């Protein structure tokens, strides 16, 4: 199936034209030329937005988002900044029950990380954890403040996937079921292979169900199978998130929230957690690129399919190309043409696919090893209307 998909992507290359990698410029390049580069690489087509290729401290990256929900619930952000935090920071935020938590996390998590890492130790797992905690506390303060006027804020949450490349170390932190996948070369032939870096906190995973049951031994209904899908308390698939105050603090489990979110019995300790899984990895010369994406992509593509699509094409437009492959597969599953899928309005598009966010980071190992950085400071956010 992958071979056919790759041939289809090559044959349809004219649908979403890609930009070649920008040539290297001297430090005297004008700001007007830089702006022209950005304009050429960034675009929008209906419910799709992209930034084909941009230089950052860790190498180059490609970003794309397609809207599937009536109101966009995915958010993303890239910050590749100057000292004191000379690092490339990536955030993918997949909201649920509304966009508010994802928007808040997008606004605050990476700035909180910059602040947490401003001390002498710099970027560490503890600094990242502190940034997640500060963002969670900030959003819960908003929920508390708006409780009487807007109680639905207590039922809004988001998955959070954060990647940080600082010097030659990669950190990946995750709440929920977005995913980071490394494409690396193995063997003498340099065959590309996928390695999943993030842990997924989804009740459909056996180890997640076991973790929940161990944490709540007195609750036989901590996970329930509904319509073939495992859910925490029969309500939500993810076991860790930012927000979702109604499953963390019992004062929000009242008649003020919608019946579908209400628990029939009180609870004495949080059901969901905001404690991220964090890995630290020393990057190697064989590590080529990392795909950061919300679960909307992984519903339709395997890890290996995704890394092969990136590896077998030029860098520019990689994120768009992955989204296009996922949408082709979504259309195939519904026995419809891709062109017809793309005509469907956002009011009903969610019946066919979720919001999908993809960020592909191409690692420049030599640059990192020398302690050099290329490009100016970079800040990217999705420009899709909500």
Curated annotation (Swiss-Prot):
| Residues where Mn(2+) 2 binds | 94, 295, 354
Q: List the EC numbers from the record.
A: 3.1.3.16
- Residues given in the record as Mn(2+) 1 binding sites: 94-95
Tell me the ranges covered by the PPM-type phosphatase domain, including all copies: 60-363
Q: Which UniProt keywords apply?
A: Hydrolase, Magnesium, Manganese, Metal-binding, Protein phosphatase
List the Pfam families: PP2C (PF00481)
The chemistry this enzyme catalyses reads: O-phospho-L-seryl-[protein] + H2O = L-seryl-[protein] + phosphate; O-phospho-L-threonyl-[protein] + H2O = L-threonyl-[protein] + phosphate
CDD domains, per the entry: PP2Cc
Keyword Aminoacyl-tRNA synthetase present in the record's keywords: the answer is no
- Note accompanying the cofactor annotation: Binds 2 magnesium or manganese ions per subunit.
GO terms for MF = metal ion binding; protein serine/threonine phosphatase activity
According to its UniProt entry, the protein's GO biological process terms are: regulation of intracellular signal transduction
Locate the coiled-coil region(s) and give their ranges.
none
Which co-factor is required? Mg(2+); Mn(2+)
Please name the PANTHER family in this protein's record.
Answer: PROTEIN PHOSPHATASE (PTHR47992)
Family to which the UniProt record says this protein belongs: Belongs to the PP2C family.
Query: By what name is this protein known?
Result: Probable protein phosphatase 2C 36
Q: Which organism is it from?
A: Oryza sativa subsp. japonica
